[in-house]
Amino acid sequence: MDRCKHVEQLQLAQGHSILDPQKWYCMVCNTTESIWACLSCSHVACGKYIQEHALKHFQESSHPVAFEVNDMYAFCYLCNDYVLNDNAAGDLKSLRSTLSTIKSKKYPCVVPSDSVLHPVDAQDRVYSLLDGTQSLPGNEDPTCAALWHRRRVLMGKAFRTWFEQSAIGRKGQEPTQERMVAKREAKRRQQQELEQQMKAELESTPPRKSLRLQGSSEEAATIEIVPVRAPPPPPASPAKDKAALPTSEDRTFKKVSDSLIKRRPMVTPGVTGLRNLGNTCYMNSVLQVLSHLLIFRQCFLKLDLNQWLAVAASDKARSYKHSAVTEAAAQQMNEGQEKEKGFVCSRHSGLSSGLSGGASKGRNMELIQPREPSSPYSSLCHELHILFQVMWSGEWALVSPFAMLHSVWRLIPAFRGYAQQDAQEFLCELLDKIQRELETTGTKLPALIPTSQRRLIEQVLNVVNNIFHGQFLSQVTCLACDNKSDTIESFWDLSLEFPERYQCSGKDAASQPCLVTDMLDKFTETEALEGKIYMCDHCNSKRRKFSSKSVVFTEAQKQLMICHLPQVLRLHLKRFRWSGRNNREKIGVHVVFEETLNMEPYCCRETLNALRPECFLYNLSAVVIHHGKGFGSGHYTAYCYNSEGGFWVHCNDSKLSMCTMEEVRKAQAYILFYTQRVTENGHSKLLPPELLSNSQHPSKETDASSNEVLS
């Protein structure tokens, strides 16, 4: 529509939520696919192809114009058409320019300058006014809402303390103190009455009829008890009595120790949501899956590379002796641990009922990672170590993984920005970067890293290299002489294509479910090579003895069979296919998968003879789901099996919910994770004894077990 009168009357509000990538999700269903922002208010909702929450908002509020965040086009509900014109202020043009800058901009990590962290959005101008008169540059990305909230809370505490010391404050506190005293007295009387009632009930209860108890009571009755007067205690001097009284320091220490002893996990370990920071659902789903893989999680709970990267990058450390350097590094690790693992608490709370373990809604249950990196040395291993400790501490229901996102932006530039990304590509890139980081750290200045730490790095590297590593046998058979040529190739996942009957885009194909075993059958089936393209060594070796003619090519067939099974089997279902030159469409066929997978039919003969039948069985551990109809848009969630609670969890960014295996089977799977069931000696054959001895839960010394607000 070239001209819409409703757009000409539009007045875009300042500080609209569309300018904040963290709010690019539907306020009703939390999806990030087909997001429409109302231009008359700050409401954000999904489009008509999802659940029509944007249309329902128009029907309730009569706000006509909405703006699509990803594709950046406007739509008028009253005109029922897309809008091409703009208002007099040029708000739509400015909005498109701003969103294009947000999506295409490279986001550097901001380093504090003069103890002030520069904010960007309109909300953080309040923080700047509160902190000082410094101007706010518009080209910085991170926000400081959490820091502003902390300063406001601290300022409120300071003013409240000052007010309580004043005459007016003390006078106002008298009625409150009287009510508290009366409340404590009533509670004490109620407790006494309850104790007296229970005592009376016990006295009126008839004796038990048990023969065993009667026999023991008769035996006890024959024992004569002679009372003996205890000698009086020696008189204590006044000085000793005074010294025996607890001091204020003793009372404080006892209070802290009692609180630590009584502390219980507030949520089930591992049931921690990850906030969507702007189209980061692909990262959140992959991180949830990796944290629920027991072997992978234990490795990174044990290993932290940050302090050793700092030592290796220091020029001054090279001049020190080996013992002095290692001692300083260890001291730096212990003293700087709390500082490096800094988080900011937020007042968000909540999980679905049944997962919080009785957590109080008033308690701070969200951790917000600092906007700047936790260390000047970017390390994905370090960020995984910190994140897994928080997620499996049982203390936090929600985490905002800013530091992890900034490390991904810095070390994997292809995922920089707020554009839609593919979870499978991100998983492959993340594992590749982690592997390279472990390899380079182990070989970088080995004299500065203790032997035990180098051994631990080697063990973790071995796990990362082998947990997903498998091998398949590529066998080519010459149809002229039946000679077979075998080649061993490695794989870290199996990309499975849909059978031919599901490749068409008709409704009949989409209505018929596909079995994951059918896709494995297609992967291992015998494939005929087109034409005479195979150069058979056997045929050419016989011909060269009797003739000098050129090389002869023959027809052949090829088959792939698995010869080495991985510890964790990743099955990537190739749902996206090219349609035309530049368009990739999704195959929306439902794939049927079971909780147990038998890989015996897909292995070669040598593997079948070498392994026991139980070694071919795999249990489903996690599933990554893609919601939506296209490659460039959609939403990722994950189903993960929580071994601590013994239940399945649906991880939808910050929203986590308990689910059944039937719900998992109904999901539209994109990546399947199966863990090998049988091991040789009762535990994982890839996990070293040093890692096995480590607890699954992080240490209570981490920041995850603290409710203190950190800057």
Swiss-Prot record:
Coiled-coil annotated residue ranges, if any: none
Compartment list: Nucleus; Cytoplasm
UniProt keyword Hydrolase present: yes
Residues that hold Zn(2+) 1 according to the record: 4, 6, 76, 79
Domain spans labelled USP: 272-677
Key word GTP-binding present: no
GO molecular function, one term: zinc ion binding
Basic and acidic residues: bias regions: 171-202, 239-251
Principal localisation: nucleus
Enzyme class label: hydrolase
Stretches the record annotates as Disordered: 170-251, 685-711
Catalytic activity, EC: 3.4.19.12
Domain of life of the organism encoding this protein: Eukaryota
Gene Ontology cellular component annotations, sorted alphabetically: cytoplasm; nucleus
Protein family membership: Belongs to the peptidase C19 family. USP44 subfamily.
Function in brief: Deubiquitinase that plays a key regulatory role in the spindle assembly checkpoint or mitotic checkpoint by preventing premature anaphase onset. Acts by specifically mediating deubiquitination of CDC20, a negative regulator of the anaphase promoting complex/cyclosome (APC/C). Deubiquitination of CDC20 leads to stabilize the MAD2L1-CDC20-APC/C ternary complex (also named mitotic checkpoint complex), thereby preventing premature activation of the APC/C. Promotes association of MAD2L1 with CDC20 and reinforces the spindle assembly checkpoint.
Protein name, entry field: Ubiquitin carboxyl-terminal hydrolase 44
Organism: Mus musculus
